[in-house]
């Protein structure tokens, strides 16, 4: 009986084709216009790349106030981005207003960061939902699970 199980297991291992998804990594620009976001060309680049690669999924961690400047300085790219961000290709993973280090501020301040940031993103991109929160370690704090649940994060 053990021999039969061994043969079946061997056949399963031989016949099973292991498949892994292609992973992509896109760096940077989370600092907004005061950090690293090159306003003159970056938004158009994002839109063009998503159009060229419809199978791509990206996460944006860009300060919400950045979109005020993008709307003024590159209105064409901004309009195109508005159409793209409501698709399944784009997710905003940190909608806090100033992307603060949460470990050194109070719960009320963190709640306001989420309120102001989500309101700003919704002003520019109505219909966007927030599912995932993904940031660097200094942005974590003990009250974060409750706050994320309050704002509807999954």
Regions found by a protein language model. Name each.
Residues 19-154:
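Carbohydrate-active enzymes and regulators
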């Amino acid at each position: 009986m053990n021999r039969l199980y061994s043969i079946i297991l061997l056949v399963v291992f031989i016949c099973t084709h292991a498949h892994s998804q292609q992973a992509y990594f896109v760096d940077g620009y989370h600092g907004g216009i005061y950090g690293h976001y090159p306003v003159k060309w970056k938004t158009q680049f994002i839109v063009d790349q998503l159009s060229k690669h419809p199978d791509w999924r990206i996460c944006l961690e860009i300060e919400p106030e950045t979109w005020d400047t993008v709307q003024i300085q590159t209105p064409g790219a901004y309009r195109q981005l508005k159409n793209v961000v409501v698709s399944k290709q784009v997710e905003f993973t940190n909608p806090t207003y100033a992307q603060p280090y949460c470990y050194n501020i109070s719960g009320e301040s963190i709640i306001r960061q989420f309120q102001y940031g989500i309101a700003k993103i919704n002003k520019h991109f109505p219909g966007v939902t927030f599912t995932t929160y993904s940031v660097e370690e200094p942005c974590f704090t003990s009250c974060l699970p409750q706050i994320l649940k309050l704002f509807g994060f999954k």
